[in-house]
From Swiss-Prot:
Key enzyme involved in DNA replication and DNA repair in nucleus and mitochondrion. Involved in Okazaki fragments processing by cleaving long flaps that escape FEN1: flaps that are longer than 27 nucleotides are coated by replication protein A complex (RPA), leading to recruit DNA2 which cleaves the flap until it is too short to bind RPA and becomes a substrate for FEN1. Also involved in 5'-end resection of DNA during double-strand break (DSB) repair: recruited by BLM and mediates the cleavage of 5'-ssDNA, while the 3'-ssDNA cleavage is prevented by the presence of RPA. The gene is DNA2. Its EC number is 3.1.-.-, 3.6.4.12. This is DNA replication ATP-dependent helicase/nuclease DNA2. It comes from Homo sapiens. Changing residue 654 to E: Abolishes ability to unwind DNA, while it does not affect ability to resect DNA.
Amino acid sequence: MEQLNELELLMEKSFWEEAELPAELFQKKVVASFPRTVLSTGMDNRYLVLAVNTVQNKEGNCEKRLVITASQSLENKELCILRNDWCSVPVEPGDIIHLEGDCTSDTWIIDKDFGYLILYPDMLISGTSIASSIRCMRRAVLSETFRSSDPATRQMLIGTVLHEVFQKAINNSFAPEKLQELAFQTIQEIRHLKEMYRLNLSQDEIKQEVEDYLPSFCKWAGDFMHKNTSTDFPQMQLSLPSDNSKDNSTCNIEVVKPMDIEESIWSPRFGLKGKIDVTVGVKIHRGYKTKYKIMPLELKTGKESNSIEHRSQVVLYTLLSQERRADPEAGLLLYLKTGQMYPVPANHLDKRELLKLRNQMAFSLFHRISKSATRQKTQLASLPQIIEEEKTCKYCSQIGNCALYSRAVEQQMDCSSVPIVMLPKIEEETQHLKQTHLEYFSLWCLMLTLESQSKDNKKNHQNIWLMPASEMEKSGSCIGNLIRMEHVKIVCDGQYLHNFQCKHGAIPVTNLMAGDRVIVSGEERSLFALSRGYVKEINMTTVTCLLDRNLSVLPESTLFRLDQEEKNCDIDTPLGNLSKLMENTFVSKKLRDLIIDFREPQFISYLSSVLPHDAKDTVACILKGLNKPQRQAMKKVLLSKDYTLIVGMPGTGKTTTICTLVRILYACGFSVLLTSYTHSAVDNILLKLAKFKIGFLRLGQIQKVHPAIQQFTEQEICRSKSIKSLALLEELYNSQLIVATTCMGINHPIFSRKIFDFCIVDEASQISQPICLGPLFFSRRFVLVGDHQQLPPLVLNREARALGMSESLFKRLEQNKSAVVQLTVQYRMNSKIMSLSNKLTYEGKLECGSDKVANAVINLRHFKDVKLELEFYADYSDNPWLMGVFEPNNPVCFLNTDKVPAPEQVEKGGVSNVTEAKLIVFLTSIFVKAGCSPSDIGIIAPYRQQLKIINDLLARSIGMVEVNTVDKYQGRDKSIVLVSFVRSNKDGTVGELLKDWRRLNVAITRAKHKLILLGCVPSLNCYPPLEKLLNHLNSEKLIIDLPSREHESLCHILGDFQRE
């Protein structure tokens, strides 16, 4: 009872006072903040912190007391008392925690001797990161934030190769000749050859250095494996926590067998993740007693230091091991240079201190955004304090980012504090930067961080352990209850082909498709993230995946789940590009001048000074096929010294223009880096380019590449030519003038030693500035192709959008008019459809490429027959609008549903309008009956719920009609396009999507021959872009008011049609 009274007292003190809200209101606020938070008790408990209060206990010592609950309704409350150093854990109301220890009378006590608290357990941090935080927490946090800033080194490559040789040997043999063979094979693998290329190393030198280690491998195997008696093994000192304190710590350790290699373990229990180099079965011989343990074996290739960082990694791996098996109580640390192995006991003190470090790091990573004390505006938070160790900082890989963040972010704060001894170093690292550069860095860091923390943009890894597969299947991002079938096929080292099928029945309806990245887990608790890879093929009965681990080592009865791995929230690449932009290099300075300081781009005066004499005839021949604006674009690019912007208005042949530009640059002998944000955009250009027999190298995962382009991928060329030497790989990289990849693929080794004459970025107006930056570092000049009047970069976070994150680099640089060329001649829309966009957006600049294009109408082979049937089934006098809609010579109309009526429905799944959906399906059905191919019809709606309803209705009668959002239709076209605007209400409620005039512009420029718009005019007039469009349509008498309950009469007509 005493504990419960204490709980009530704490509720009075902190829950009310600390929150500064009445308890009920504060609880509601917490619940609203975590509507989908999963809470639970038991071994995998997850508690929500309701209140925090720091008090002095009866002994006068400080305690931190937490009111916690594992109940979603917040009814059942418990108390957690933190004592000793646990008081320093920066836990706050609203935090999620996991507790290890015992709970008595609804009270947990965590102190120096017993129990652990894990802060934000869903944030999985690697053991390597935590170990590195021992000397400098700031460096560890920066390394997690600016991942791509840690450079590859010779030592890292040697270490990776040696790890692999050892791991292969422990499953084969440590005989000298076998080790030589394994080393030779490993050094020939493409991924290692690529790193040698990146670092400009000699393959023979690497081979020799690796071979120098091999005698130590033999020594270790001789010492710790395959002995006759237990006393033959070296003596060691190891006391396990479970040992009797009187036991002698001297023992002999025997490595019996390897259990796993690179075992991947995710632990939401301890908030950790990692890959254990080798998991081994070990016998500990102590006198006449023998204990058997399964332990982590950590391999180190550097100096034999037995350092605290190395030992800490091993201790953390023992915690990870507990997710899969009994507590190993210790691990092993092996230095490959000498063959010396150390046992590392994992006692409570070490685990406690490391988990406290993990909590500090998690807090810094979780709280990357703060509110300024004075102005209450959102800002980046301070990082852990800069240490006062000049020697340590001198060799730190994050020193540049550390100094940059300090000067650009922290020193702008009211409470900034920097050690005086470090000020000269910070100045030295950042003195080349202007205030405008620092502000650009700070702003984009803030916007990227806001976007990454957006509720809709967070990685959903935690759903793997929080949500059952059956629940996740409803969203289409998961397939559960899978069993492995047939043998696993080894495609190459590190890639394994697996076939899965559902244990009961067919594969459920899913959004997963070939090329998607997936995480494979076991349905059983603790088998999270067993492997990662790609979906290779999916059909009604099987899913084929290419994975990075061989799962056949698991029992045949193991049930698996596949979860789609979302990548849209990955800010590693853009933050890395931002950091690179601030470096003190020639390329970075030039880009800062152009992009941040808006230096005017420069141009060459005469084309003759650019064009090689022997290329002039070829270029002239290519130019003949272009219209005037396209020829102007070619000339502008050739004359540029810095950059060119090509505005590709709808239907103006943007892809053809880029393909032609590449052909001209190729003919002139220029090297070209061709990029875009999506794989499909890159491949669309390459498909056209391939027809002209121009060679190129396509970088990127082959699973993401169009089948017709896969023969040009690095992976396929290396396989077909059996490239196993650095010389052959260099020859491949140097043989192609044209290299193509996505903007996210710029970490490829080829870019470490290659600078291109030109970089062309397609879809540039849709790409976020820091992502678009990436490829520009590797070219002398760049060409951005896009149209800022169409879709901008996708930004989910409203605050980031308000700060300017949706401004693309294309839009930013467009103010320099001298660099801009507009493509205005379009070949898609007939003149009536084109006039809408001209009026709404382009101020009359768009023109049809020919009379044929201007006058083109839909060809409905059976239109006369359908017209007769409509007149028979529908009273023409009651439906005069019906014939007008289907008349080929009426390309544009807006159907006003105000009188029908067609009210919207707002539900949990989103906004929809069933009446509009029925009308859209009716119209589609008549067009198909009149002779239009379903594949020539496109249906656009702004809301996903509306798409689902239309798809469901169409599935009953018509297939192959593409139903999608505006975003998915960018760059596409159809003969007939029907647009459902959905919103229709009496209270003036408006949504965000229809306020975007750029989306509207895309929607009305997808149709070639007929555009039918459907919506409620009074409701849509609340949206300024639509109001402007509706006024124009009204002036042209293109708005048709549908009669009352028209959808019902049309459904009867459709029923009669279908019965026929």
